[in-house]
């Protein structure tokens, strides 16, 4: 029997307390279709979010700001092929949840969008790197991402690996040189992002995910599954939110409350992803549906069943909302709506 020893990793618990795309702005009708469910939920969310908050417009505005900044940060230059590969994935149409979380957290603690944009872009660069590498034949071996052929299918495995590597470098360079706040805040933000993606974060989640595939579910319990998802998925949403709070000048108490919020929605994001993987088509998801089932990977529906997985998602959403109590009622609306969006998204 194969067992996984997680004792070498720090415990992270959820607290209940080949055409190259040019830059294209996201048009309102594209997001309105995706966010229609969220808006209806937002309007009735226990009175916390009032229905006059236009979440669709907020997401469109922030996503376009991020896309413009990314397009400017990673221009097409020599060597052409590697920059084509980077831009192919980085500028592909995505929801931009992580950078928007970063901006929303910054604004919540009193910062400005312009201050948060470098950190938001750095997080999206890291996220894109993780997608490129995750899709490789030696990892998840996927052919479709964001409705398009995966990077290695277009540019080859060798260039795809290098594109991901370059994005890591770009992310830290951009965060270090473009963030207009005190050096102390920049250093703190760099440390948070580095910790999130290394062998105590994203890499840890990925390696345990790889080694647990095909194992009998009686040998691998929810503790292992939570470890994978907290480290592989939640950790980067946490980093995005915490970076926004740091560069925005948040207090230590505000940063930690937002950290707990982000851990909840980060795990929620993956629980919902697991549910969608078995309930939606590839066309609806923009990526290969049912791939976790085919690969015999651990998922929440596999271990808990579909209905209990949905109940767990509801609990995580409630816990996330709880962490935002005490913040300014107007400035907190985007984060509350983002949590609802993550819970109710359809792709």
Curated annotation (Swiss-Prot):
One of its GO terms (biological process) is carotenoid biosynthetic process. This is Geranylgeranyl pyrophosphate synthase 7, chloroplastic. Residues 1-39 form a transit peptide. Disulfide bonds: none annotated. Binds 2 Mg(2+) ions per subunit. Monomer. Dimethylallyl diphosphate binds at residues 145, 232-233, 270, 287, 297. Mg(2+) 2 binds at residues 134, 140. Keywords: Carotenoid biosynthesis, Chloroplast, Isoprene biosynthesis, Magnesium, Metal-binding, Plastid, Transferase, Transit peptide. GO terms for cellular component: chloroplast. It is an enzyme of class 2 (transferase). Belongs to the FPP/GGPP synthase family. It comes from Arabidopsis thaliana (Mouse-ear cress). It is found in: Plastid, Chloroplast. Mg(2+) 1 binds at residues 134, 140. Pathway: Isoprenoid biosynthesis; farnesyl diphosphate biosynthesis; farnesyl diphosphate from geranyl diphosphate and isopentenyl diphosphate: step 1/1; Isoprenoid biosynthesis; geranyl diphosphate biosynthesis; geranyl diphosphate from dimethylallyl diphosphate and isopentenyl diphosphate: step 1/1; Isoprenoid biosynthesis; geranylgeranyl diphosphate biosynthesis; geranylgeranyl diphosphate from farnesyl diphosphate and isopentenyl diphosphate: step 1/1. NCBIfam families: FPPsyn (NF045485). Pfam families: polyprenyl_synt. Its cofactor is Mg(2+). One of its GO terms (molecular function) is dimethylallyltranstransferase activity. The keyword Nucleus does not apply. PANTHER family: FARNESYL DIPHOSPHATE SYNTHASE, GERANYLGERANYL PYROPHOSPHATE SYNTHASE 7, CHLOROPLASTIC.
């Amino acid at each position: 029997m194969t067992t996984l020893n997680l004792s070498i990793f720090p415990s992270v618990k959820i607290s209940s307390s080949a055409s190259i795309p040019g830059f294209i702005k996201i048009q309102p009708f594209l997001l309105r279709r995706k966010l229609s469910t969220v808006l209806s939920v937002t309007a009735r969310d226990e009175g916390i979010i009032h229905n006059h908050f236009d979440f669709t417009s907020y997401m469109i505005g922030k996503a376009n700001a991020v896309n413009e900044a990314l397009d400017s940060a990673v221009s097409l230059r020599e060597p052409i092929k590697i920059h084509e590969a980077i831009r192919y994935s980085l500028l592909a149409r995505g929801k931009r949840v992580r950078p928007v979380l970063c901006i929303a957290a910054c604004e919540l603690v009193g910062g400005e969008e312009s201050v948060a944009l470098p950190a938001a872009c750095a997080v999206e660069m890291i996220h894109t790197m993780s997608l490129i590498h995750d899709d490789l034949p030696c990892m998840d071996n996927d052919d479709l991402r964001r409705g398009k052929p995966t990077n290695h299918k277009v540019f080859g495995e060798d260039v795809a690996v290098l594109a991901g590597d370059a994005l890591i470098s770009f992310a830290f360079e951009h965060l270090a040189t473009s963030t207009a706040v005190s050096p102390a805040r920049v250093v703190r933000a760099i440390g948070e992002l580095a910790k999130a993606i290394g062998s105590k974060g994203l890499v840890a989640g990925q390696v345990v995910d790889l080694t647990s595939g095909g194992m009998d579910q009686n040998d691998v319990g929810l503790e292992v599954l939570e470890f994978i998802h907290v480290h592989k998925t939640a950790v980067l949403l946490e980093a995005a939110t915490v970076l926004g709070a740091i560069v925005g000048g948040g207090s230590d108490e505000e940063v930690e409350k937002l950290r707990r919020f982000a851990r909840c929605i980060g795990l929620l994001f993956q629980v919902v992803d697991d549910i969608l993987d078995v309930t939606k088509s590839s066309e609806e998801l923009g990526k290969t549906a049912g791939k976790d089932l085919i690969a015999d990977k651990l998922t929440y529906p596999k271990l808990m069943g579909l209905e209990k997985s949905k109940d767990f998602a509801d609990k995580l959403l409630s816990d996330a909302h709880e962490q935002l109590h005490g913040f300014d009622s107007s400035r907190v609306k985007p984060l509350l709506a983002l949590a609802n969006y993550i819970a109710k998204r359809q792709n």
